């Protein structure tokens, strides 16, 4: 009887351990494109001087880059930068200006309507578009498509332009302050 009990226990242990094992997912073609694009972005960041002025930190996602810029800003305490390489063969760049250490949230400003109108004007006239994320935090953004290959020179131009967002924050100040 004890031999059968041991056999049953071993069989149960084998079934339980086998059920906990999951096959590793195969890398999809989209993942390969994302990984190659991310490697190219990292190469630009490592070699392009304006990108090296941004302090890059460990990103939360496997195809994300995160950093912040705080050199010589007049209106923002710092600019938080998030770059995502998507499955749709695009690169998203989002820059969240911090005003006195906090994101500019439409629910916490003096004039939400005026802020949104000014952000729409910026989107029409400026290099970056402006928007709100799901938390209603304001950001300046840019989006690249990879249809014609990796846009290295365009990426450099956008990275070089990130500090200019600080001037737009100055234009938003009348709508932020209470």
Task: Give the residues covered by each predicted segment.
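N-terminal secretory signal peptides that target proteins for export/translocation
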Residues: 1-4
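Bacterial N-terminal signal peptides
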Residues: 9-19
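Charge-rich, low-complexity N-terminal segments
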Residues: 24-78
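Short, internal acidic amphipathic alpha-helical interface segments
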Residues: 28-30, 48, 94-138
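A mature extracytoplasmic/lumenal domain signature
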Residues: 69, 85, 95-99, 134, ...
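A short acidic-to-branched-hydrophobic micro-motif
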Residues: 75-104
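A short, solvent-exposed beta-edge/loop patch
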Residues: 120-170
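Short, highly charged C-terminal tails/helix-capping segments
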Residues: 174-178
